[in-house]
């Protein structure tokens, strides 16, 4: 799986993403040609080599003439009606949706009414759609990122003096691991944060992969300590095993009606939790208790924590980052004398291919056919063995 890792040691912005993708081999004429498929005009796109400190990278410049303000609804229409390829449209719209939802929360307006003002509107369109074009052209199948530095200070805007990071940036990074590196300027822009929020699958250290190429996108600020660059590593995921950085949230409960645990588990799974465990424990004062453990993607931290506090008697949770090493898997179907059933296939590093019947399908078929679920499992495994 071709993976891009965004190393945001100096933050991230839309133009830095474009610069890094060009540095990785995206031809400028391809980028320009694809952007012309959107019905916008009044800009000149260029790129040049620049240094930040001792490191050279690609800096993108977009010179924009006076532009009208554009609403999120209008921008979505422009992208949807363009001749861009479907994967590019989907990624672009996903990023703009994240951005519009964040701006809507900041200004307390419906997302469709969010306006991107004048130059900023076109700049966002070119940065976001350009990033989607670059990822598609380079064949990136998975995007991961480092922790994100927030920056600090204040900036003068048309809305007055605003704190940094911008309010929309903070909302976009909910559920994303962030940190303060002490630099008092804008490091992560709303556009950069929206790209990560919409497209990054995980955040943390570099995933296991064989690095094939590296690109540097140069930011507008001339800062060289640390160098104002976005580094993007592109490589192939290491064969056989996949590594994901996840969160483990747990809490110990000794005073809740046990009938409620089933409901709590359903709520957590509905929210997107990857796994939920209930572990018996002995607490202080020799009270029997339950340790509730939830495995989840970092982006779901806020939602899962809220469910735990709303649905249980917990007064606090423990949160830790964990690495999950897993076998690659895919879902298929097999034919049995009782009907079709889904199967989860995994491939081990030593070449073994294993099949696991999908429980819900087996349960449904067993009830429909009036046969023991054990027999359905046996038939599914036999069919899977014949199909290997």
From Swiss-Prot:
Keywords from the UniProt entry: Nickel
Pfam families, per database record: Ni_insertion
GO MF: lyase activity; nickel cation binding
Family, per entry: Belongs to the LarC family.
Protein name as it appears in the record: Putative nickel insertion protein
Organism: Syntrophobacter fumaroxidans (strain DSM 10017 / MPOB)
